[in-house]
């Protein structure tokens, strides 16, 4: 799952933006949700791109 974290000061100015993701692609600003079509290394899934079905999958929850 992806979470976009933002912090604002009292004037409403954006101070910090960080993408929290379980994927190894941490510099991406957006990711494709599970169930969407993907190709490895082309569309970045929030989880991972299944090489067989070409569909974004969520990482298993532990």
UniProtKB/Swiss-Prot annotation:
Which keywords does UniProt give here?
A: Calcium channel impairing toxin, Disulfide bond, Ion channel impairing toxin, Knottin, Neurotoxin, Secreted, Signal, Toxin, Voltage-gated calcium channel impairing toxin
Q: Which residues form the propeptide?
A: 8-27
Where does this chain mainly localize? Answer: secreted
Protein origin, superkingdom: Eukaryota
- Family of the protein in this entry: Belongs to the conotoxin O1 superfamily.
Respond yes or no to whether keyword Disulfide bond is given for this record: yes
Tell me which species this is from: Conus bullatus
Any one annotated GO CC term = extracellular region
Q: Which GO terms describe its molecular function?
A: calcium channel regulator activity; toxin activity
Q: Briefly, what is this protein's role?
A: Omega-conotoxins act at presynaptic membranes, they bind and block voltage-gated calcium channels (Cav).
Q: What is the lineage of its organism?
A: Eukaryota, Metazoa, Spiralia, Lophotrochozoa, Mollusca
By what name is this protein known? Omega-conotoxin-like Bu11
């Amino acid at each position: 799952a992806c979470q976009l974290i933002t912090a604002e000061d009292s004037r409403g100015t954006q101070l910090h933006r960080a993408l929290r993701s379980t994927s190894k692609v941490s510099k991406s600003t957006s990711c494709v949700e599970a169930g969407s079509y993907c190709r490895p290394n082309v569309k970045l899934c929030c989880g991972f791109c299944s090489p067989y079905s070409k569909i974004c999958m969520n990482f298993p929850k532990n």
